[in-house]
Regions:
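Active-site proximal loop and beta-alpha junction motif in alpha/beta enzyme cores
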Residues: 1-141
């Protein structure tokens, strides 16, 4: 997806359509001073069934899945958007050690196919800050 956003500089459009493994997606680019500042995409309906995510959990939807990394406990909500995601709330994303915890949590036994780990900070009712540890890739700007 990131490569498509970079192409904007050549085509000067605010909407870009791309084909992904999860289907065709439309990206809406927020442009400021001729640079892509943010990208918005409708990823469709999330998959919430544990066996389809996949995640090992008796609870559906999977909320408050408690996992531990380096003696720190996390509570995750898990979804699939074509691949497994586990989201947890942290106090401050800027100071949070994403690499330290992401690489451990990605391969937790609760995730048979590994998982993308999102560390989210709630700013207000409409905004969050998030950092992403992508399975097999490390921290990304996704």
């Amino acid at each position: 997806m990131c490569r498509k956003v970079c192409i904007w500089q050549r085509i000067y459009k605010t909407t870009v359509t791309i084909e992904t493994l999860a289907g065709i997606k439309t990206l809406k680019l927020n442009i400021k001073d001729k640079k892509v500042e943010t990208v918005r995409v409708d990823m469709g309906e999330p998959i919430l069934e544990a066996d389809k995510i996949p995640v090992i959990s008796k609870e559906e939807p999977v909320k408050n899945l408690e996992l531990e990394a380096e003696n720190r406990k996390f509570k995750f909500t898990c979804v699939s958007m074509g691949n497994p995601h586990a989201i947890t709330i942290v106090e401050n994303t800027k100071e949070f050690e994403v690499e330290r915890y992401g690489k451990i949590l990605e391969v937790d036994k609760a995730f048979p196919k590994k998982a993308n780990i999102e560390f989210a900070q709630v700013i207000d009712k409409e905004n969050i800050k998030m950092r992403v540890w992508e399975r097999g890739a490390g921290e990304t700007l996704a």
